[in-house]
């Protein structure tokens, strides 16, 4: 009986009614228990990975108008910022395991810094410059962001669930920090766009410090033989046996021609093993699609269609809103959305969901509801829209971070690193689809509103 009582006391539960000091002490104790076993260095490193890897993406989108001018659709910047990342996430999981993590970090930092320098140093459109150089810089930064996400998410496999929670929180903070820092630098501090972007090009160096100086390296030692890649332990043993057989002592009667023939057979078997590994990885992806990749894809299509195609048309008369200008609505929506994303992406130590489709379908309902509002204008107050946008951010962040948490729980250990990296393609694919849809959808919604007597979208 005493043992049972001890067990019950160890189970987390809500504080019982009583003295406030006692309840607060119990709450603090259980709060600390949630983080039992967390390595502060791991959490700090992965939080910085998430922040820096995503913050340049946000800075570029925040600077879209300044980068390409008013005559070029901002969707061009979005697509240049997303399509290379999508291509990287689609292709790289099948070969990036051959590149050691330290080398990847150096490559990503170089691409990010070079991309931001190209964007910052190319002449502005007002001085006769073209946007081609700026778009090239955005593409380089996007390649780095895509490769960084699939690598860092895969890296969480070796550092446990707290690394994933820290990564998710860092990516959520990137939206707030990126948009806020750009607005602060260019408005409150009065810095030029060029100076702000030049300062941003120094941020990737933080990833070098985080990886080589903050992150404990011991969990990576077992995978120092990078050529082994994603292969299961059993397969590695089989390959070792094959190599031992093929490279073992040969009979003294073998002549040079037979040795060359043996080397040719080994090469052919190596190529065959590579092809078999590729086909096995494709089979893994098919197994990931419905439980993990599809709900993440759906939530991102709905989320970014709202952000890029619908929310620019969710406008109210100025005398019924807290704003003095119509162009203030969109930044306010974006800030509220980013707060929701940050909260939900930081939530896995406290709250987990296992049904990934439920929040995805709720996000689709958000898209339908806000589209109907843009068309029929039946919601009486902008403050209700604020609540829906905040809810949108919560749902999107929940699906993102819980998708990878579920992979960590449900996918076999030997397949986990590949599965985590391969699934990152879903968010980029969703953003790409939403980018193309939004370029048409926003125009259609605005035209509808104008023809029905609401021309607010033309006054921005």
From Swiss-Prot:
The chain crosses the membrane at residues 42-62, 76-96, 105-125, 135-155, 164-184, 195-215, 287-307, 323-343, 356-376, 378-398, 428-448. Keywords: Amino-acid transport, Membrane, Transmembrane, Transmembrane helix, Transport, Vacuole. GO terms for cellular component: fungal-type vacuole; vacuolar membrane; vacuole. Gene3D superfamilies: MFS general substrate transporter like domains (1.20.1250.20). GO terms for biological process: L-arginine transmembrane transport; lysine transport; regulation of intracellular pH. It is found in: Vacuole membrane. Its main location: membrane. It holds the Pfam family CLN3. It is a multi-pass membrane protein. Involved in vacuolar transport and vacuole pH homeostasis. Also required for cytokinesis. Belongs to the battenin family. PANTHER family: BATTENIN (PTHR10981:SF0). This is Protein btn1. It comes from Aspergillus fumigatus (strain ATCC MYA-4609 / CBS 101355 / FGSC A1100 / Af293) (Neosartorya fumigata).
